[in-house]
């Protein structure tokens, strides 16, 4: 029941955010068709709770391995799930930025959730596609493996994504358990 409480809280927050953005985009021409992706996480009693909408991602970094915890709500991920294309093809697909879910696009939103065990030393990465679209999981893992402060790791992730042609804005959060 505790798990459900945390997930209910997170999905409720997503629904509230969705309503706010949706109402704003419908009441003010300046914000017409406004929408966003979102990923949120909370840690309680050695469990990581993740809620997300769109293609912003959550990863768990443990023992030099990056583990994606989310699955993009995107057109190309639908093709991957159907077996029409591979994950490698999806990364280069012309429609790779077309998302199938977002906050603020409709009056309701479907939020996906994940619960994953965490342990001391794990690093949780939440990021937009400005980062995950430019760096491979292995490249991010290499940076997170460095024996430097967490804020330095974050700065290097952004620098490297920009160096590789980052054309999108980049938001990220790193949390060490």
Model regions: which residues?
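PP2C/PPM-type serine/threonine phosphatase catalytic domain
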Residues: 1-177
């Amino acid at each position: 029941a505790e798990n459900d409480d945390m997930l209910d809280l997170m999905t409720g927050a997503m629904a509230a955010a969705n309503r706010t953005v949706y109402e704003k985009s419908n009441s003010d021409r300046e914000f017409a068709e406004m929408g966003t992706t979102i990923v949120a996480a909370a840690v309680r009693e050695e469990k990581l709770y993740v809620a997300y909408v769109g293609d912003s991602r959550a990863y768990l970094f443990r023992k030099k391995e990056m583990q994606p915890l989310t699955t993009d709500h995107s057109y190309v991920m639908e093709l991957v799930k159907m077996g029409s294309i591979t994950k490698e093809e999806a990364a280069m697909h012309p429609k790779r930025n077309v998302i199938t879910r977002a906050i603020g696009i409709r009056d309701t939103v479907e939020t996906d959730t994940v619960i994953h065990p965490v342990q001391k030393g794990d690093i949780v990465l939440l990021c937009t596609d400005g980062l995950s679209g430019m760096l491979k999981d292995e490249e991010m893992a290499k940076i997170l493996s460095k024996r430097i402060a967490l804020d330095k790791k974050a700065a290097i992730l952004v620098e490297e994504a920009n160096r590789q042609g980052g054309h999108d804005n980049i938001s990220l959060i790193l949390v060490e358990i």
